[in-house]
Amino acid sequence: MTPPENKNLVQENKELIQEVLKA
């Protein structure tokens, strides 16, 4: 996995975690 893809996945994961915490 290339670093840019990894950064994007980390960003998506953070957003998903925020959604779960809000729920």
From Swiss-Prot:
Subunit structure: Tetramer of two alpha and two beta chains. Forms complex with the iron protein (nitrogenase component 2).
Domain of life: Bacteria
Keywords: ATP-binding, Iron, Iron-sulfur, Metal-binding, Molybdenum, Nitrogen fixation, Nucleotide-binding, Oxidoreductase
Job of this protein: This molybdenum-iron protein is part of the nitrogenase complex that catalyzes the key enzymatic reactions in nitrogen fixation.
Residue ranges of the region described as Disordered: 1-23
Taxonomy of the source species: Bacteria, Bacillati, Cyanobacteriota, Cyanophyceae, Nostocales
Transmembrane region(s): none
Cofactor(s) the protein needs: [8Fe-7S] cluster; [7Fe-Mo-9S-C-homocitryl] cluster
Chemical reaction(s) catalysed: N2 + 8 reduced [2Fe-2S]-[ferredoxin] + 16 ATP + 16 H2O = H2 + 8 oxidized [2Fe-2S]-[ferredoxin] + 2 NH4(+) + 16 ADP + 16 phosphate + 6 H(+)
Keyword check for Electron transport: no
Name assigned to this protein: Nitrogenase molybdenum-iron protein alpha chain
